[in-house]
Amino acid sequence: MLTLQIFEAFAIILCVYFLWSRRRFYIMMLKLPGPMGFPFIGLAFEYIRLKRKIRLRTILFKIYGKTVLTWIGLTPVLVTCEPKILEDIFTSPNCSNRSSVVDKAISSCLGLGLLTLKNNHWNERRKLLLPSFKNNAVLSFVPVLNNEANFLVTLLAEFVDGGDINLLPELNKWSFKIAAQITMGDEVRNQANYQNGNLLESYKALNNLIPIGVVMPWLRNKYLGKLFSYEKRRLEAATQSNAFIKDIIDKKLSSTDNSSEPALIDRILNLVRIGELSYDDVMGEFSNIIFAASDTLSITVNNVLILMAMFPKYQDNVFEELAEVFPSGGEFEASHADLEKLVKLDRVLHETMRLIPAVPLLIRQTSHSIQLSNGFYIPEGVTLMIDIFHTHRNKDIWGPQANAFNPDNFLPENKRARPPYSYLPFSKGKKTCLGWKLSLISAKLALAKILRNYMLSTTFLYKDLRFIDNTTMKLAEQPLLAVKRRI
């Protein structure tokens, strides 16, 4: 009996200590609007019940306003789509790190890289990698981009007048080929698991496992992960991707042949040779780059094609511009100077990234307390959800028709009139995506060749699009497109 009483007293003391140590969170909860959700799990169950649909945050913002405090598990989460609050977050040195839960989920699948490094380690790594993404380096990849875009032109010829199709699987293959070749060099084309598609399947598996590891972090426990087969799937996919990268690195380090096309690996391995980076550093970095680049590019191009099919007036406007710059059509070569002339295509691309951003959500964590411009005090240890999707549809910024497709939103005069943190397709501040310029050039070049040669249509309505959170944006139902050849 005495033992039981001692145990109960000890449990009460622990509980009181736990609550007292988190008092700053509960004080914040009294000042900021938002739901608590269920005990211990917060809104995690509701998020899973809705199958990760973005609609949950739409409901929260409608009820509680543009900045909401809620809970996932025992973690307080501040969700916002207010540009001024986003500016506070992006410009604060105390909000530069991702949530530790997200970092662990990513690094367990991809290894350590710019996606997960923190503070000084991140600063040093970015400084080392930045020259590889400068303008001249990016433009050196245009021949590779032209070749792979021509592959798309040839591929789509097979679908002409062949009924409605889902283009995303083919675009996934195309974007993965670009990411792998630009990162690892043209030698990847000789790799068996690259040719047979197994490598792409491995990265797709990792893309699905990362958000599961974020929402259900207990699955990263070795024993629980095995029990629910999470660990088996993670290990299989990570092993295959790592083996591919290791094989290419080893061949590059032992080779004296410099005749291949330029690739990031050649520049970055020079940092290994002079001792600036370790072998493990580049293993993780290459995995991070391939993962981040391939999925976002295919999603963006696919979404542009979908919206062009839904809005034929804008598709015709873009075609007229393309026909003027590229009179011949077919498998033409496009230079960077050519792409700079495509202002209508550029507006369509940016409007698509506004309405359907490839990355709908960024997650940070306060390393020290900060005070927001609205006067609210956010203590250390709070998870910050930067809701890009709803920021891009914020009616206070984009007007009453914020949800409508309108490329004129990106006319020069309209861009100048908006707050700087209202459009975030590649993040913002010092953690802006390193490859943003390469991504835009890749997308514009592929879109130019597709839309110059083909006309797309669909019976799927814009209002019926439904969006799902993932590492990258997913559509609940993929619209099917019909392809016709342009004369």
UniProtKB/Swiss-Prot annotation:
Its main location: endoplasmic reticulum. Its EC number is 1.14.-.-. Its cofactor is heme. Pfam families: p450. The keyword Transmembrane does not apply. GO terms for molecular function: heme binding; iron ion binding; monooxygenase activity; oxidoreductase activity, acting on paired donors, with incorporation or reduction of molecular oxygen. It is an enzyme of class 1 (oxidoreductase). PANTHER family: CYTOCHROME P450 4C3-RELATED, CYTOCHROME P450 FAMILY 4. The keyword ATP-binding does not apply. It is a peripheral membrane protein. This is Probable cytochrome P450 313a5. GO terms for cellular component: endoplasmic reticulum membrane. The modification Phosphotyrosine is found at residue 223. Keywords: Endoplasmic reticulum, Heme, Iron, Membrane, Metal-binding, Microsome, Monooxygenase, Oxidoreductase, Phosphoprotein. May be involved in the metabolism of insect hormones and in the breakdown of synthetic insecticides. Belongs to the cytochrome P450 family. Heme binds at residue 433. It is found in: Endoplasmic reticulum membrane; Microsome membrane. InterPro entries: Cyt_P450, Cyt_P450_CS, Cyt_P450_E_grp-I, Cyt_P450_sf, Cytochrome_P450_Monoox. Gene3D superfamilies: Cytochrome P450. PROSITE patterns: CYTOCHROME_P450 (PS00086).
